[in-house]
């Protein structure tokens, strides 16, 4: 019994020792496992750090690659520009090496395709035409370029115009409207009927069977709005406005004035629809005398050319001529006959209502005091033209500026009336200071 108990105790001790040894072995294995786990975590962290470094390096390389691409594109563009410049310089060099061409004028086109050309050096040539030249552009009077050796026509040049004629083209479409003109309602209606309507609705005249006037004569005192009216018509008709003063056509050399008139109408045809406005037409259109001097005869030649040009276009063409003068009484009757300036529109000095409308137009952008009475100003400025009223408004504004004010008062206007109209009284002796 005792032996059995001792044996059991011995077995238990052995089992305990086995368990203890197993426990120690497992603890040793567990330590080894954690050690390996720590090693793996360390390697993982090192690998992750390496990956982050590689990612940063990759981003840096991608950025450098993008910069390289941009630089490459810029270099390609620079190379393209250089190639274009080199080609242009090469072309310029080739052109510089070519001998200059001679300018000539075509006088006649022959049946066999050749042309008779008068060169700028004087002699005439029967010349061949280069295949590169558009024969539709070849016509008598055309300017052409001639080869020095063969005298062949190698190019058709643009028609030559005097720089003074080109300077006459004021505006493709002036910015003046009928709202900018006061006191001329009847005159506006008349000029619209004879100028604007034929340009915008020519088919209406064809249906009715009447021809509109070719030219309109505006006459009246200076400063009454003749030029302004012509500009407004050009604007509303959407036409090119070509303005000149007739004294510009009075030239020193024989035939010079007539040539300017000819080129003026050529420009009008090119820019059609167009309105030619000739101011102070009495400078070339005065009544012709038998006992004229050489200077008078040159003026008469210019007038004759103007009459010929007006006879040379159809009333329904896209060209209208408006002339202005202060001296209708001295004009040559040939100018005023039907087919030329056959519509005469008088532009008088404005009446009181007209002056009031003009004052409203010129003061609409001004900063006026409450005491400004435009009706009174219209009443006291009898005999004033539209230009005088504009000068009065400008002078009143200048008086306010002179006193560092941003509001124009009635007193400013009265002083301006006194100054502007007083000066007119000195010149004409006609103005009466009605407000005193």
Curated annotation (Swiss-Prot):
Intrachain disulfide bonds: none
Subcellular location as annotated: Cytoplasm
Cited SUPFAM superfamilies: P-loop containing nucleoside triphosphate hydrolases
Record key words, sorted: ATP-binding, Chaperone, Coiled coil, Cytoplasm, Nucleotide-binding, Proteasome
CC annotations in GO: cytoplasm; proteasome-activating nucleotidase complex
Superkingdom assignment: Archaea
Region (Docks into pockets in the proteasome alpha-ring to cause gate opening): 434-436
PROSITE patterns (UniProt xref): AAA
Chief location category: cytoplasm
Parts forming coiled coils: 7-98
Gene Ontology terms: biological process: proteasomal protein catabolic process; protein unfolding
Positions contributing to ATP binding: 223-228, 362
Subunit structure: Homohexamer. The hexameric complex has a two-ring architecture resembling a top hat that caps the 20S proteasome core at one or both ends. Upon ATP-binding, the C-terminus of PAN interacts with the alpha-rings of the proteasome core by binding to the intersubunit pockets.
Similarity section: Belongs to the AAA ATPase family.
UniProt name for this protein: Proteasome-activating nucleotidase
Organism from which the protein derives: Methanopyrus kandleri (strain AV19 / DSM 6324 / JCM 9639 / NBRC 100938)
């Amino acid at each position: 019994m005792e032996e059995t108990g001792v044996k059991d105790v011995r077995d238990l001790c052995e089992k305990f020792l086995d368990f203890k040894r197993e426990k120690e072995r497992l603890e040793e294995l567990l330590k080894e496992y954690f050690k390996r786990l720590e090693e793996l975590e360390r390697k993982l962290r090192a690998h992750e750090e390496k990956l982050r470094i590689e990612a940063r390096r990759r981003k840096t390389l991608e950025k450098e690659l993008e910069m390289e691409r941009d630089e490459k594109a810029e270099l390609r563009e620079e190379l393209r520009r250089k190639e274009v410049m080199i080609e242009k310089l090469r072309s310029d060099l080739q052109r510089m090496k070519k001998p200059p061409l001679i300018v000539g004028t075509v006088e006649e086109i022959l049946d066999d395709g050749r042309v008779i050309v008068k060169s700028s050096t004087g002699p005439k040539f029967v010349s061949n035409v280069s295949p590169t030249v558009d024969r539709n552009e070849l016509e008598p009077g055309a300017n052409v370029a001639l080869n020095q050796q063969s005298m062949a026509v190698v190019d058709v040049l643009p028609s030559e115009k005097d720089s003074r004629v080109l300077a006459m083209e004021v505006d493709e479409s002036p910015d003046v409207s009928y709202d900018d003109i006061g006191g001329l309602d009847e005159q506006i209606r008349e000029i619209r009927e004879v100028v604007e309507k034929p340009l915008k609705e020519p088919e209406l005249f064809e249906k009715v069977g009447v021809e509109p006037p070719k030219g309109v004569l505006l006459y009246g005192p200076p400063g009454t709005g003749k030029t302004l009216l012509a500009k407004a018509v050009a604007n509303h008709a959407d036409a090119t406005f070509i303005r000149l003063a007739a004294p510009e056509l009075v030239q020193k050399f024989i035939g010079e004035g007539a040539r300017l008139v000819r080129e003026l109408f050529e420009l009008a045809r090119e820019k059609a629809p167009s309105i030619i406005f000739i101011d102070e037409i009495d400078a070339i259109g005065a009544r012709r005398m038998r006992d004229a001097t050489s200077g008078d005869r040159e003026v008469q030649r210019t007038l004759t050319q103007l009459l010929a040009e007006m006879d040379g276009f159809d009333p329904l063409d896209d060209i209208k001529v408006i002339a202005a003068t202060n001296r209708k009484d001295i004009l040559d009757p040939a100018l005023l006959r039907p087919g030329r300036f056959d519509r005469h529109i008088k532009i008088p000095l404005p009446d009181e209502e007209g002056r009031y409308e003009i004052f409203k137009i010129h003061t609409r952008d001004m900063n006026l005091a409450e005491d400004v009475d435009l009706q009174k100003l219209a009443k006291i400025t009898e005999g004033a033209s539209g230009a005088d009223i504009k000068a009065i408004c400008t002078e009143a504004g200048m008086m306010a500026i002179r006193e560092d004010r941003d509001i124009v008062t009635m007193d400013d206007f009265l002083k301006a009336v006194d100054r502007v109209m007083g000066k007119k009284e000195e010149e004409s002796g006609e103005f009466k200071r009605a407000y005193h």
